[in-house]
Curated annotation (Swiss-Prot):
This is Alpha-glucan phosphorylase 1. Coiled coil: none annotated. Belongs to the glycogen phosphorylase family. It catalyses: [(1->4)-alpha-D-glucosyl](n) + phosphate = [(1->4)-alpha-D-glucosyl](n-1) + alpha-D-glucose 1-phosphate. The modification N6-(pyridoxal phosphate)lysine is found at residue 808. GO terms for molecular function: 1,4-alpha-oligoglucan phosphorylase activity; glycogen phosphorylase activity; pyridoxal phosphate binding. The lineage of its organism: Eukaryota, Viridiplantae, Streptophyta, Embryophyta, Tracheophyta.
């Protein structure tokens, strides 16, 4: 029998059987009915690799390649391992240990002398990846064969978190890998902790995208994710005496063991240039700057399923011919490599600073790169599956494109460009296809987050796309005029101003005269008697005043902008909000004019989070309790079963186990805090946590001012009075402030100053500690959330679209304090009003409250004035907080007048915190509240959300592999 042996550049997953590729491996067995591999060397060999074998893997495609016979003296016929065809990567511990040792030797990233934790992690990850590749190839070979409709999820962020524990857990290989690593002198948890968090996202937007991918795979939906491969991420946060400092992320410094570079999957991306007519009469975009987007694939495994989907990340580079060798050899090294740098920098940093024109251009390049590369790839895959008979009308029947916020909105003109300019379709046909294919998820009601781009910049950078956008805008104007007519010019003008894609741009020439307002009537003698000046009197008055005429200041023309949210609404077939209250605000306020025109487009899809990562894997203590008490582990896939805990909420045995699990998780956080900050905290104190992006609307400022008030009151009491009045608390913050967001960075600085003062006050001791955990990420969240007892979700009502951390906290038995905002509303409904601490103004009150403030009618509460005065007393150091506290002062002006209503909600917040203390003193009551939160969180699984997207927006079906 012909065999193929593993070479030093192998993954270790190639078969040594009569099969010619990974694709054929997963589609058929060999003659004897078994899968045979030489993956795991049987002998206990020295781990020093041969120098000639130190090559890195580059799997270029999943297509079959010609058979090959390569000999390797290291492996002989006695070393074959027979693995079951159902799960070829579910071997025993001995086989897994051999696999890990194999990768330590033959896919090394470290020197061969020592086999220590970092090397153990990479070898283990490569071993697990072998399993993923097998299932991954099986998944897409089957999808290609049955040619199913597929969803493509485009997002600027994917905040994945560590992959090793998640992959091993989803594959059901915890025991095998745990035992194997013990044989090698390691434990799985320590090895997994070596993995850096991928720096591909920042906040809830990216984490939601990653939860969705997990659910898509777990539920067997055919789907891909598309994003960018950021070399340095957002930034690594350091906390110093000056507050937050930013440094480049180094997550790729030792490479990423999960990704597979697809050098054969690359697409040209163009910027600048000009638009001309080709010889066929069709428009062509030529000249300008050309770069290449290269695919890096990351397998995403489902839980207890063979389905493994793909996250395709794009990296950018310049074509080799753009390297100016002549300039380089003449000593002009920087000039020679300029094109290379300009291409590569597109994927350097997530959300580069955009205060400069160059920064804005870079961000726009990022967004277009994501859209263009992804759509070229999607179109190519559609054509391949269609064979030689491509019917473009079927494109929306095979492809669904979901835009995660407005960042990928250039998908709309880009798909139009591809269909018209490259595939020869008419405008009408291309527009119908585009609208049926694309859908848009709105994530915000904040005006600054509803993206707008300078028309001038876009015309320069993407001239063909601006032509297409102008045409879409013209068609929109035609629709608006047709809908509202010209009888009421004021109404028509109002609608056009609100709904057009192009802002502050003259109407298209075809509609230049559509708004005709009545001319003023001539003044009659009767008018003159009533005090109205005649034309002659006006001329006389004007003549008398000519001598005193003042030349007016020149009017500054407002900038011409492209409104991406409007383009997303017009160009797609569905628009969804991400929580019930948010979707109502979207319909009633943000896009109300569009709702009146196309009500069928708008819907709600309340966010969710994956219960695999956010309970099952990050909180094994709680997971075991849930499984034991409801009698099945099926809740991991069917979270509605968690609701069965409600009937045991008062059971003393359950409550005792529940508190013990929480204590174990708190002890882990005690160690984390000591390691990251140097502070020692008591595990017996309440853990009060707010971890999220630092932003004024999320109101970390309200939280820390509440802590300041608490501290002030403590200082006014004797020791015995303090202990009687207050429950011991550890108040934990985490989150990053954008590098250019000055006010958010001031909040970080203020929190750390308050922490330094309180934590070093011997009178307070363990009664109150304030901790800011630096460089917050998914891995930190996986420790903090299971240990949390109170979590703060206190945004100004109506400003948080949904939030997902509130769901994670609730799942883990944490009681929430918050406003009626975002998903808080639905969480409170599910867990019970008595198990949620509610305070603050409601969303429908906010406009009037701001109006009252502007009119000088707001009277601040004395406690709020007391706190501000205390902050200004210098108790927290010599730093000035005038700018920070000044934002809470006055009645009008940019950056003032307490826009986020911290002062308005402060007394309600303090009163609510007193109720928290009261409830926590009764541990039986508190534990019941905790259990009811977990039991009521079942709705907030991303599995439910993805089922809704699949049914209502994407129209895709679940596809189980045979």
């Amino acid at each position: 029998m012909d065999t193929m042996r593993i070479s030093g550049v192998s993954t270790g997953a190639e078969v040594l059987i009569q099969c010619n590729s990974l694709s054929s491996l997963v589609s058929r067995r060999c003659d004897d009915g078994k899968w045979r591999t030489r993956m795991f060397p049987a002998r206990n060999r020295d781990l020093r690799p041969s120098p000639t074998r130190r090559s890195f893997l580059s799997v270029k495609s999943i297509s079959s390649e010609p058979k090959a016979k390569v000999t390797d003296a290291v492996l002989d016929s006695e070393q074959e391992v027979f693995i079951s065809s159902m799960n070829p990567f579910a071997p025993d511990a001995a086989s897994v240990a051999s696999s890990i040792k194999y990768h330590a030797e033959f896919t090394p990233l470290f020197s061969p002398e020592k086999f220590e934790l970092p090397k153990a992690f990479f070898a283990t990850a490569q071993s697990v990846r072998d399993a993923l590749i097998m299932n991954w190839n099986a998944t897409y070979e089957y999808y290609n064969r049955v040619n199913v409709k597929q969803a493509y999820y485009l997002s600027m962020e994917f905040l994945q978190g560590r992959a090793l524990s998640n992959a091993v857990g989803n594959l059901g290989l915890n025991s095998a890998y745990g035992d194997a690593l013990k044989r090698l002198g390691f434990d799985l948890e320590s090895v997994a902790s070596q993995e850096p968090d991928p720096a591909l996202g920042n906040g809830g937007l990216g984490r939601l995208a990653s939860c969705f991918l997990d659910s898509m795979a777990t539920l067997n939906y055919p789907a891909w994710g598309y994003g960018l491969r950021y070399k340095y991420g957002l930034f690594k946060q350091r906390i110093t005496k000056d507050g937050q400092e930013e440094a480049a992320e180094d997550w790729l410094e030792l490479s990423n063991p999960w990704e597979i570079v697809r050098n054969d999957v690359s697409y040209p991306i163009k910027f600048y240039g000009k638009v001309v007519f080709g010889s066929d009469g069709k428009k062509r975009w030529i000249g300008g700057e050309d770069i290449v987007a290269v695919a890096y694939d990351v397998p995403i495994p489902g839980y207890k399923t063979k389905t493994t989907i793909n996250l395709r990340l794009w990296s950018t580079k310049a074509p080799s011919e753009d390297f100016d060798l002549s300039s380089y050899n003449s000593g002009k090294h920087t000039e020679a490599a300029e094109a290379l740098f300009n291409a590569e920098k597109i994927c350097f940093v997530l959300y580069p600073g955009d205060e400069s024109t160059e920064g804005k251009a870079l961000r726009l390049k990022q967004q277009y790169t994501l859209c263009s590369a992804s759509l070229q790839d999607i179109v190519a895959r559609f054509e391949t599956r269609s064979g030689g008979n491509v019917n473009w009308e079927e494109f929306p029947e095979k492809v669904a494109v979901q835009m995660n916020d407005t960042h990928p909105t250039l998908c709309i003109p880009e798909l139009m460009r591809i269909l018209m300019d490259l595939k020869g379709l008419s405008w009408e046909d291309a527009w119908k296809i585009t609208q049926r294919t694309v859908a848009y998820t709105n994530h915000t009601v904040l005006p600054e987050a509803l993206e707008k781009w300078s028309l001038e910049l876009m015309e320069k950078l993407l001239p063909r796309h601006v032509e297409i956008i102008e045409k879409i805008d013209e068609e929109l104007v035609r629709t608006i005029v047709s809908e509202y007519g010209t009888a009421d010019p004021d109404l028509l003008e109002e609608k056009l101003k609100a709904m057009r894609i192009l802002e502050n741009v003259e109407l298209p020439s075809a509609f230049a005269d559509v708004i005709v307002k009545p001319v003023n009537k001539p003044v009659t003698a009767k008018d003159a008697q009533n005090g109205v000046k005649t034309e002659q009197e006006e001329e006389k008055t004007a003549g008398e005043e000519e001598e005193d005429e003042v030349i007016p200041e020149p009017t500054v023309e407002p900038p011409k902008m492209v409104r991406m949210a409007n383009l997303a609404v017009v160009g797609g077939h569905a628009v969804n909000g991400v929580a019930e209250i948010h979707s109502e605000i979207v319909k009633q306020d943000v896009f109300n004019d569009f709702v009146q025109l196309w009500p069928e487009k708008f819907q709600n899809k309340t966010n969710g989070v994956t219960p695999r990562r956010w309970i099952r894997f990050c909180n094994p203590y709680l997971s075991d309790i849930i499984t034991n008490w409801i009698g099945t582990e099926d809740w991991v896939l069917n979270t509605e079963k968690v609701a069965e805990l409600r009937k045991f909420a008062d059971n003393e045995d359950l409550q005792s186990e529940w508190r013990a699990a929480k204590k174990k998780n708190k002890l882990k956080v005690v160690s984390l805090i000591k390691e990251r900050t140097g502070y020692t905290v008591s595990p017996d104190a309440m853990f009060d946590i707010q971890i999220k992006r630092i932003h004024e609307y999320k109101r970390q400022l309200l939280n820390i001012l509440g802590i300041v008030y608490r501290y002030k009151k403590m200082k006014e009491m004797s020791a015995s009075e303090r202990e009687k009045a207050f429950v011991p608390r550890v108040c934990i913050f985490g989150g990053k402030a954008f590098a250019t967001y000055v006010q958010a960075k001031r909040i970080v600085k203020f929190i750390t100053d308050v922490a330094s003062t309180i934590n070093h006050d011997p009178e307070i001791g363990d009664l109150l500690k304030v901790i800011f955990v630096p460089d917050y990420n998914v891995s930190v969240a996986e420790l903090l959330i299971p240990a949390s007892e109170l979590s703060q979700h206190i945004s100004t009502a109506g400003m948080e679209a949904s939030g997902t951390s509130n769901m994670k906290f609730s799942m883990n038995g944490c009681v929430l304090i918050g406003t009626l905002d975002g998903a808080n509303v639905e969480i409170r409904e599910e867990v019970g009003e008595e198990n949620f601490f509610l305070f603050g103004a409601k969303a429908d009150q906010i406009v009037n409250l701001r109006k009252e403030r502007a009119e000088g009618k707001f009277v601040p509460d004395p406690t709020f004035e007391e706190v501000k005065k205390f902050v200004g007393s210098g108790v927290f150091g010599s730093n000035s907080y005038d700018e920070l506290i000044g934002s809470l002062e006055g009645n009008e002006g940019f950056g003032r007048a307490d826009y986020f209503l911290v002062g308005k909600d402060f007394p309600s917040y303090i009163e609510c915190q007193e109720k928290v203390d009261e409830a926590y003193r009764d541990q039986k009551r508190w534990t019941r509240m905790s259990i009811m939160n977990t039991a009521g969180s079942f709705k907030f699984s991303s599995d439910r959300t993805i089922h809704e997207y699949a049914k209502d927006i994407w129209n895709i079906k679940q596809v189980e592999l045979p």
